[in-house]
Amino acid sequence: TVPAGSQPGKTPVIDASVHIFSKSNKDLRSFMREPFKSRGFPDYEMDWYGAPGGEYVEGSRGPDGQYPGSDPEIVAEHLFGDRGVDVAVLHPMGRGIMPDRHLGTAILAAHNEMLVSRWLDHPEFGEKFRGTIRVNPDDISGALREIEKYSQHPRVVQIGIPLQSRELYGKPQFWDLWEAAVAAGLPVATHIEPGEGIAF
């Protein structure tokens, strides 16, 4: 649904892929639990290729140098104020396929908790944000837990998986995941991220 206050008869402007991040690795760890909280994992930018002109929108870093896309107020100012967007579909950026599937699930679960508590339930802008619940296709039971936990949140609109996979996504080991997505009424979005495996 379109947020209250939108102009009647106006076609809403929806940004369908807004990348959001935690403020730092330390910030992300605040949403994690042991034994994973103290484990090592890659930084967001470890495997990125530098883009000509820079990776981020100018002025998008937080006031204390936080990652761009980590502050709901700054993102809202750019999207809803400067660009005239009505609804933003948020896609938390993870670390792709991890060698330890349980660590991978813990990282994505932390992103989901951050997404809901910091963005979707934001007192001022939450109504304009929609969320992508990130799940780990390498850990189906962990993925199903995340879907069950968040699928009834009114602002969750899709499930997100990395584009890369160790196996083709049509294979039987993924069927429980797709069936859970159908049962929840949530489409599945793919997004390229760091990691090793088969890329489409």
Protein language model features and the residues they cover:
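Helix-coil boundary/capping segments in enzymes
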Residues: 1-200
